[in-house]
Structures are given as C-alpha cells and as structure tokens.
C-alpha cells in the first residue's frame, strides 16, 4: 500500500484576545463564574473582530505553507459550522441561490493559483472535520496515483453575538492547515490509521448528554483506532487531544477506563485559546514538534469529538 505522509502544519487564531473575565463580563458565555473556566484549564480565548471572516482566517493559515504546495490534486476545505461553508452575503436581498453557493474552497484554489486542484467541502463532521480530512486525503492519494499532494484546511468563526461556550468549553475562532503527500515531509509524520464513530441519534442533543456520551465513545474510538493500526495502547507515545476540561482527560486515562499515562496526553494550547473548533489537534501537534519531546519513530494519536455526534482519531508516526 502506498505510504502517505503529513506535515507543514499551520494555524491562526481570531484577532481579538480576551481573558475569561472579559468574555464573561461581555455575556459571551453561559457560565458566569470565571473561576469555573480557570479551574477547567481555560484562561483566554480568541474571537474575530466584526470585519474578519472565516475565509480571512483560512487564507492566513495557508499563506505560511503555500511555498510547499506542489502538484496539489485536491483541496479539502472543512468547516464545523455550515454557515462558514459559504461566503456569499447578499441572498436576503437578491433571493438568488447562487449567493448561497459562493464556496470558500473555490476562492482558495483561485487565490493560491492551485488551478489543477479539485475542491472538496467537508461540513457535517463539526469539530472532527480536520481529522476526517486525514482519512479522506489518504484514500484519495492512494486511489489517484497522478496526485502527489492534498491541501487540508479548516476555518471557522462564530457569527456575531454568538455564545463562545459549548459543552462547558471556551471556544476560539481560528483556522488551521496542513499538507498530506505521497512523499516524506521534513519534520513530518507517516499516516498510519484512522477510526471514526458517528451516532446520528444524538444529532441534536444538549451539553449534558454530549458530556455523558463523551467518555464511552472516546474509549471505543481510541481503542479501535489502535487495534486497526495493529498496535497496542502502550505503543502510543503521545495523545494529542481536544482542548476540553483538563479533568475529563484524567478520567479518560484512569486505570478503570483507558489506563493511559496522563503525562503523555498533550494539549498545551488549552490555557491560551480554549477549544479552537476543528483546529485543536493541529495546533497541539505543531506544539509537540516544537517542544522537541517527540522522537523519530514514535506514534502519536490525534483525537477529536464533535456535534453530530462524531468521534474521530488518527494515528501518525513521527519521521523527524
């Protein structure tokens, strides 16, 4: 089977930084006690100014890695919120559905001169869309031998006036990107295996039910991903995870559940940005590389959960 490689991670956050105290004072959250956020690991988050669009974030995330784009066969453009999968703004005036199909992926292709790239929108996997992109891109590269690269992008900002708290987590606007390739990428990874679970019966649920389903399905998703990779949990050197309440990962990793070393669970961006919609795993993976803690040959498992409800994880092996 054709080897697939991943690297050149990039991300950008909303342009306005706020402390939990500021955002609570401005009524952007349901929780009204800043200390409850801080005790869960959240200190700050980033939101977009009114003039900044999700597409602006996408462009800013791709720019630093644009020089590495070569023979791009496809662009996978993921959005957690369907509203960010269209950049048209005049439908209410025109009533013309063309204004609902002004797709950001097409603009990205044109703006970066990726004229041979096929554009794919991925917009029903919520916060797991970026991990879904790994699987989709790997399958496409293996099925299309004339392609050598796929650009994966996710970009979301909440609409003006939105609550920036979901399932008791503080949210940041942001975008991230990476390149997946048939050739090794310096400082990158080899794609190993992916697993996903969707429970459509929980498509429209509340925060408490989401939390209740988090633990058993997280265990199942991670365990099955490891099994499908032909590995054991002890082979996973690092888990790069979603930025949620720090105590949740202590429960997941406890001896009665996953029985995994909590010191190997990596999410250092949590205090500075909270949960950046689909991008946590990319930000934290880049930070793991920059930390120098990960060594060539080590396995890392990236994990996210999103509304829908969908759980996804992917295992990569660091090439260095």
Task: Tell me the role of every PLM-derived stretch.
Residues 78-83, 124-128, 154-159, 304-309:
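Acidic, glycine-rich active-site loops and adjacent beta-strand->loop/helix elements
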Residues 29-34, 99-113, 145-156, 193, ...:
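Acidic-glycine-rich active-site phosphate/pyrophosphate-binding loop
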Residues 55, 59, 89-102, 115, ...:
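Claisen-condensing/thiolase-fold acyl-transfer catalytic domains that form or cleave C-C bonds
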Residues 5-7, 73-76, 149-151, 237, ...:
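Conserved beta-strand elements of the Class I
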Residues 69-95:
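Membrane helical hairpin/interfacial module
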Residues 1-51, 164-224, 305, 314-320:
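Condensing-enzyme catalytic core mediating Claisen C-C bond formation in acyl metabolism
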Residues 58-74, 218-237, 256, 288-293:
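Phosphate/pyrophosphate-binding loops at sites that engage ATP/ADP/AMP, CoA/4′-phosphopantetheine
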Residues 132-139, 152-175, 220:
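Active-site glycine-rich loop that binds ribose-phosphate moieties when present
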């Amino acid at each position: 089977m054709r080897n697939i490689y991943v690297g050149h991670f990039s991300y950008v956050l909303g342009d306005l930084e706020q402390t939990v105290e500021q955002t609570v004072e401005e009524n952007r959250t349901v929780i009204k006690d800043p200390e409850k956020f801080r005790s869960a690991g959240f200190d700050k988050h980033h939101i977009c100014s009114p003039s900044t669009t999700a597409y602006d974030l996408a462009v800013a995330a791709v720019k630093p890695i644009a020089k590495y784009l070569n023979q791009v066969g496809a662009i996978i453009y993921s959005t957690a919120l369907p509203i960010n999968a269209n950049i048209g703004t005049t439908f209410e005036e025109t009533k013309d559905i063309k204004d609902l199909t002004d797709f950001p992926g097409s603009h990205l292709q044109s703006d970066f001169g990726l004229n041979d790239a096929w554009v794919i929108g991925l917009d029903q996997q919520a916060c797991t869309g970026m991990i879904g992109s790994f699987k989709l891109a790997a399958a496409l590269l293996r099925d299309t031998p004339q392609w050598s690269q796929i650009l994966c992008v996710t970009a979301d900002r909440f609409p003006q006036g939105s609550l920036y708290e979901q399932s008791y987590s503080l949210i940041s606007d942001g975008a991230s990107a990476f390149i997946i390739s048939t050739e090794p990428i310096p400082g990158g990874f080899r794609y190993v295996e992916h697993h996903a679970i969707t429970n459509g019966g929980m498509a429209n649920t509340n925060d408490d039910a989401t939390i209740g389903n988090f633990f058993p399905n997280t265990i199942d998703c991670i365990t099955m991903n490891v099994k499908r990779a032909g590995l054991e949990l002890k082979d996973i050197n690092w888990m790069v995870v979603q930025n949620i309440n720090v105590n949740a990962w202590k429960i997941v990793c406890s001896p009665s559940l996953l029985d995994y070393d909590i010191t190997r669970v990596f999410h250092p961006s949590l205090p500075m940005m909270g949960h950046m919609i689909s991008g946590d795993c990319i930000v934290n993976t880049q930070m793991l590389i920059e930390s120098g803690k990960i060594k060539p040959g080590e396995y890392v498992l990236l994990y996210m959960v999103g509304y829908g409800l969908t759980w996804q994880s992917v295992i990569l092996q660091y090439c260095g």
